[in-house]
C-alpha cells in the first residue's frame, strides 16, 4: 500500500487539515502545526486536538502517515548563539505540538551556515541541537529533509544527511525525507530506471533505506544540478513521470507518507490518481 497525500492547509485550526486531505482522496498528508512564518503561537487547544484526532480517524488516516513540517524560520545551524537558541526553542515547541497531536514525525530542513562558518561546523551545531531536542522530548522522530543546495543551505548531499544521523545519539528517532525536486536540483538523477537505481543505490550505501521515513513527490522547474528549489506539477517539469513510476514501484520503500508539494493544489486529487496509476498492480 502506498500512502499518498499533499501538504494541506491547516487554516482555521489544525483540525481542518485532515478534512482537506480527505477532499483530495489522500491517505496521508503534511501540515504546519503552527504558523510557519512566526516564532511563537498560542498553545494548541484541547478541543482542536480532540477534533484533529477524530477527523483523522474519520478520514482513515493513521498518525504514522502524517508528516508535520516545522517553521521556515528555524535554523539549527545558525552561527549566532542567541539566534540558534531561538531556533532551538522553536524546534522543541514544534516537537511538543506534534506529540500533543498524537503524531510520530517532524520533518525539518537541517540548517544554513550563512557563509559565516564551515559546513562541518554548521553540521555539528545542527547535530547538537537535534540531540538536545531528543533529550527534552519523547517519541517523535526527527525527519531530516534533503535540500536543493540553494544558498548556504546544507543537506543537499547524502553524505551530509548521513553525518547528522551518525551523530544522533538515538538512531530510533531520526530519519530522512527525500524531496525529489531537491534531489534532482542537487545533482541526483531520477529520470530513468537506470538513473533512479544508481541514485537510490547510493542513498542506500550512504544512508540506508531503513532511515527513509517520508518522501516529498515534486517535479522540478529547472534541470539537473540547477541548485534551484522550484517545484513543478508532476510530469510538467524536468523530472518527468518516469521518475515517479520508479518510486511507486520501488519495493525497498516502506509504508511511508508520500507528500505532494506541487504548485497547483487544484489538481492534487488528479496527481494522487496519477501516482496510484503508475503503481503496477495498484496495491
From Swiss-Prot:
The gene is nfo. It catalyses: Endonucleolytic cleavage to 5'-phosphooligonucleotide end-products. One of its GO terms (molecular function) is DNA-(apurinic or apyrimidinic site) endonuclease activity. Binds 3 Zn(2+) ions. GO terms for biological process: base-excision repair. The keyword Hydrolase applies. Keywords: DNA damage, DNA repair, Endonuclease, Hydrolase, Metal-binding, Nuclease, Zinc. Endonuclease IV plays a role in DNA repair. It cleaves phosphodiester bonds at apurinic or apyrimidinic (AP) sites, generating a 3'-hydroxyl group and a 5'-terminal sugar phosphate. InterPro entries: AP_endonuc_2, AP_endonuc_F2_Zn_BS, Xyl_isomerase-like_sf, Xyl_isomerase-like_TIM-brl. Belongs to the AP endonuclease 2 family. Zn(2+) 3 binds at residues 182, 229, 231. Its cofactor is Zn(2+). This is Probable endonuclease 4.
